[in-house]
Curated annotation (Swiss-Prot):
The gene is queC. This is 7-cyano-7-deazaguanine synthase. It catalyses: 7-carboxy-7-deazaguanine + NH4(+) + ATP = 7-cyano-7-deazaguanine + ADP + phosphate + H2O + H(+). ATP binds at residues 15-25. It comes from Azorhizobium caulinodans (strain ATCC 43989 / DSM 5975 / JCM 20966 / LMG 6465 / NBRC 14845 / NCIMB 13405 / ORS 571). Keywords: ATP-binding, Ligase, Metal-binding, Nucleotide-binding, Queuosine biosynthesis, Zinc.
Length: 241
């Protein structure tokens, strides 16, 4: 958390409706007086997440009256151009596989850079200083735009380019998926964990039918595997305590 988070401060959360962004939304609601959310429609195969995010926002407000009082406007931006220039498994109906460069073909070049740039432009207009994202480089697929160095460099560029002092908050940067589940429990109790399991969406293929202990998804894509492995470690630690 940044040092100047407190009464009167506001935050804009990049909120996709997935596990990580739901946890970061809870984190922001626990810290800031006013919290708005931002989602993106960029032609993703798992576009069902846009439907899930509406349900998750409502469920989080119902879960905690204090959160409901802080939760402000929700924004959605269409970024069709990002999907048009990206030849990836997230925006094309192709099999998920590793590329010669060592990255999975689910990597959408520049996605987080574009997301955070638009988020900063919106935060500028809305008078919000803190921009919160679920980027992480501890337990991730190797995406370069999730790295701490990238986020820090982008914060400098955005502040120079907009003559503001935005703070890019990444509360998940140095924790793994098991710790992300534990953070959700600390923030909202088992009720928030259950909400994340049942209502959030992570699967790259957009599968909502199969129901696993960790939630809905195909169970085989990289996103599902990370979520499942993290949940298994989280549950094992709970049993041993």
């Amino acid at each position: 958390m940044s040092a100047d988070a407190g009464p009167g401060s506001g935050a804009l959360v990049l909120f996709s409706g997935g596990q990580d962004s739901t946890t970061t939304l809870a984190w922001a609601l626990d810290r800031f007086e006013r919290v708005e959310t931002l989602g993106f429609d960029y032609g993703q195969r798992h576009r069902i997440e846009l439907d899930c995010r509406v349900k998750v926002r409502a469920a989080m407000a119902a879960l905690n009256p204090a959160w409901a009082a802080k939760l402000g406007e929700d924004h959605t931006l269409a970024l069709d151009a990002l999907g048009a220039v990206s030849d990836t498994a997230l925006t094309r109906d192709v099999a998920i596989e590793m590329t010669e460069g060592g990255l999975p073909n689910t990597f959408v070049p520049g996605r987080n850079i574009v997301f955070l740039t638009f988020a900063a432009a919106l935060a500028y207009r809305r008078g919000l200083k803190h921009i919160v994202g679920g980027m992480c480089e501890t337990d991730f697929s190797g995406y370069p735009d999730c790295r701490d160095d990238t986020i820090k460099a982008l914060q400098v560029a955005l502040n120079l380019g907009m003559d503001r002092r935005f703070v890019l908050e990444t509360p998940l940067m140095w924790i793994d998926k098991a710790e992300t589940w534990r953070l959700a429990e600390r923030l909202g109790g088992r009720a928030l964990v259950d909400l994340i399991v049942e209502d959030t969406h992570t699967c790259y293929l957009g599968e909502r039918g199969p129901r696993h202990p960790w939630g809905h998804g195909c169970g085989t894509c990289p996103a599902c595997q990370l979520r499942a492995e993290g949940f298994a470690r989280y549950e094992a630690a709970r049993v041993s305590e």
